[in-house]
Amino acid sequence: MWYQSASLLGVAAVAQAATVHYSLDLTWETGSPNGVSREMIFVNGQFPGPAIILNEGDEAIIDVTNHLPFNTSIHFHGIEQKNTPWADGVVGLSQWAIQPGQSYTYQWRADTYGTYWYHAHDKAEIMDGLYGPVHIRPRPNRDSPFSMISDDPADIRAMKQAERNGKLVMLSDWDHLTGQEYMKAMEETGYDIFCSDSVLINGRGSVFCHDPEELTQMVPPPELAILNSSLTDKGCLPFVPPIQGNWEHHPDKVPPGLNEGCHPSTTQETIFTVDAAHQWASFHFISAASLKVLVVSIDEHPMYVYEVDGRYIEPQLAHSVKLYNGERYSVMVKLDKEPANYKMRAANDGGNQIVSGFATVTYEGGETSQRPSQPYIDYGSRNTSADVIPLDTNHLPPYPAISPASEPDDFHILMLGRTNSSWEWSLDGAAFLPSNLAALPPAILSPQAPEFADALKITTRNDTWVDIVFQLVVSETTPIQPPHPLHKHSNKGFLLGTGHGKFNWTSIKEAKEASPESFLETPVYRDTFTTSPQGETWTAIRYHVENPGPFLLHCHMTTHLQSGMGLILMDGVDVWPEVYADMITPM
């Protein structure tokens, strides 16, 4: 079986803190998640990988055995790794690569609650299917925000139960090329390629082929303005100069079928079964997408968003939620509709391709109505009416309230842009290539190692607050930038604000005094911060250094990280953890 069924993703776990063991066996086999066969990665013989279910406070021991024909490692995305930085899963920073035939054990404590995921952190193996969900159930006495949705005690009890038994929903894009083939295509053509074949929901999807003119009508106005033709039959933007910049390109080397040449195929959709007797259902959405920004909705079912990146927020009502790469949102849904089949839709935001994936939410028991459900969004992610409410991602107040320090101890501006071609990206003018780290002694052994003297990095002291401003650079070589979902390993940080133009100030304080409208009244607390694609813009964050070790800060678009868009946070160098080589060496 090549997929993980929706029912299995809700597997039960022990109800009290314990030591919980999981084994993940990685194999390279032929699969067809969207009806087209290709080689891919399976975890324990399935795709996506099995769910890791824990209770808050549990000790997780996860044994990974690599039967793949290449090196790998596993990162537990969003897990803070407090006091276990050697378990972060980044080759060259926290461990040596797990070579073919080797095994490696990750051990960490589930200090937090919420929705996370695990995935490959070597090369472009996410694009080959190495990922699976993680859910940590909150301790029974943890304060939850459900009373802000309903003050009915029965409703609150039902919502707490729904959270514990939530439906884990992995949203991803899928390509007929392997990850390494995709990266090779960019290197040989010089193009920044972003076309996918399918959108998958829990490992199932189809290839849909529509009329290019019909798809072009769904293109958002900013992208429509730069089109000099229609979209391709796969719904992808053609390779146009405003997107690709003033670099050398080789269109004759684009692999057939990559950007155009659509051939339909189908598989059975994932089905999520809900029971109206439970009153409420919770869906834990996880974006495992490599290239796509996915907007998710459930027909005729408003959603109360109550958790973002593994942290409660004051619940927000929304009909659709946009997920950038690596983000997680948990929602509560009232089960008060007639028994029927309701579409779950995951549509690309439309910036680089018009494409969607689908699943079905069905009510258990009773006669099922055959009428089609009414959507909130269309195939191109556009709202179907003026009444549709998208989630406002700038208004996500943490629950309970939490705020950053009023002043930082350190301040950095990073200049985001291209380096040597359309497809090579950087966080600050130089390429940070993960592939170059594989042969080096991992940085966790010593922050002063000469191998990392010239690496792109930020060095901090423990118990300090750090401000980082991400400045998008616009030039002839980069006339337009896509949104960059910048994921911070280790602990979360605060999104302070965003603005247009250049960040011409020497501090956040100075910027707030000059442009108060650019800053959020309540900073958003999360582990992924997405830049605005609207020309020359900046995004400001603040985080607390409280977990010494080497951690990545990087764009979570797989192709962007692999081409150089990352840097090292050498956090807490004054109290660096003592680590021995055998702790981080696979066997």
From Swiss-Prot:
<dbReference type="InterPro" id="IPR045087">
    <property type="entry name" value="Cu-oxidase_fam"/>
</dbReference>
<dbReference type="GO" id="GO:0005507">
    <property type="term" value="F:copper ion binding"/>
</dbReference>
<dbReference type="InterPro" id="IPR008972">
    <property type="entry name" value="Cupredoxin"/>
</dbReference>
<dbReference type="InterPro" id="IPR001117">
    <property type="entry name" value="Cu-oxidase_2nd"/>
</dbReference>
<dbReference type="InterPro" id="IPR002355">
    <property type="entry name" value="Cu_oxidase_Cu_BS"/>
</dbReference>
<keyword id="KW-0325">Glycoprotein</keyword>
<comment type="pathway">
    <text>Pigment biosynthesis; melanin biosynthesis.</text>
</comment>
<keyword id="KW-0732">Signal</keyword>
<dbReference type="InterPro" id="IPR011706">
    <property type="entry name" value="Cu-oxidase_C"/>
</dbReference>
<feature type="signal peptide">
    <location>
        <begin position="1"/>
        <end position="17"/>
    </location>
</feature>
<dbReference type="InterPro" id="IPR033138">
    <property type="entry name" value="Cu_oxidase_CS"/>
</dbReference>
<feature type="glycosylation site" description="N-linked (GlcNAc...) asparagine">
    <location>
        <position position="383"/>
    </location>
</feature>
<feature type="domain" description="Plastocyanin-like 3">
    <location>
        <begin position="397"/>
        <end position="577"/>
    </location>
</feature>
<dbReference type="Pfam" id="PF07731">
    <property type="entry name" value="Cu-oxidase_2"/>
</dbReference>
<feature type="binding site">
    <location>
        <position position="487"/>
    </location>
    <ligand>
        <name>Cu cation 4</name>
    </ligand>
</feature>
<feature type="glycosylation site" description="N-linked (GlcNAc...) asparagine">
    <location>
        <position position="462"/>
    </location>
</feature>
<feature type="binding site">
    <location>
        <position position="119"/>
    </location>
    <ligand>
        <name>Cu cation 2</name>
    </ligand>
</feature>
<dbReference type="Pfam" id="PF00394">
    <property type="entry name" value="Cu-oxidase"/>
</dbReference>
<feature type="glycosylation site" description="N-linked (GlcNAc...) asparagine">
    <location>
        <position position="504"/>
    </location>
</feature>
<feature type="domain" description="Plastocyanin-like 1">
    <location>
        <begin position="41"/>
        <end position="137"/>
    </location>
</feature>
<dbReference type="GO" id="GO:0042438">
    <property type="term" value="P:melanin biosynthetic process"/>
</dbReference>
<feature type="domain" description="Plastocyanin-like 2">
    <location>
        <begin position="168"/>
        <end position="350"/>
    </location>
</feature>
<comment type="similarity">
    <text>Belongs to the multicopper oxidase family.</text>
</comment>
<feature type="glycosylation site" description="N-linked (GlcNAc...) asparagine">
    <location>
        <position position="71"/>
    </location>
</feature>
<dbReference type="InterPro" id="IPR011707">
    <property type="entry name" value="Cu-oxidase-like_N"/>
</dbReference>
<keyword id="KW-0479">Metal-binding</keyword>
<dbReference type="GO" id="GO:0016491">
    <property type="term" value="F:oxidoreductase activity"/>
</dbReference>
<feature type="binding site">
    <location>
        <position position="121"/>
    </location>
    <ligand>
        <name>Cu cation 3</name>
    </ligand>
</feature>
<dbReference type="GO" id="GO:0046148">
    <property type="term" value="P:pigment biosynthetic process"/>
</dbReference>
<feature type="binding site">
    <location>
        <position position="77"/>
    </location>
    <ligand>
        <name>Cu cation 2</name>
    </ligand>
</feature>
<protein>
    <recommendedName>
        <fullName>Laccase abr2</fullName>
        <ecNumber>1.10.3.-</ecNumber>
    </recommendedName>
</protein>
<keyword id="KW-0560">Oxidoreductase</keyword>
<dbReference type="GO" id="GO:0009986">
    <property type="term" value="C:cell surface"/>
</dbReference>
<feature type="glycosylation site" description="N-linked (GlcNAc...) asparagine">
    <location>
        <position position="420"/>
    </location>
</feature>
<comment type="function">
    <text>Laccase; part of the gene cluster that mediates the biosynthesis of dihydroxynaphthalene (DHN)-melanin, a bluish-green pigment and a structural component of the conidial wall. The first step of the pathway is the production of the heptaketide naphtopyrone YWA1 by the polyketide synthase alb1 though condensation of acetyl-CoA with malonyl-CoA. The naphtopyrone YWA1 is then converted to the pentaketide 1,3,6,8-tetrahydroxynaphthalene (1,3,6,8-THN) by the heptaketide hydrolyase ayg1 though chain-length shortening.</text>
</comment>
<feature type="glycosylation site" description="N-linked (GlcNAc...) asparagine">
    <location>
        <position position="228"/>
    </location>
</feature>
<dbReference type="GO" id="GO:0052716">
    <property type="term" value="F:hydroquinone:oxygen oxidoreductase activity"/>
</dbReference>
<keyword id="KW-0186">Copper</keyword>
<dbReference type="Pfam" id="PF07732">
    <property type="entry name" value="Cu-oxidase_3"/>
</dbReference>
<feature type="binding site">
    <location>
        <position position="75"/>
    </location>
    <ligand>
        <name>Cu cation 1</name>
    </ligand>
</feature>
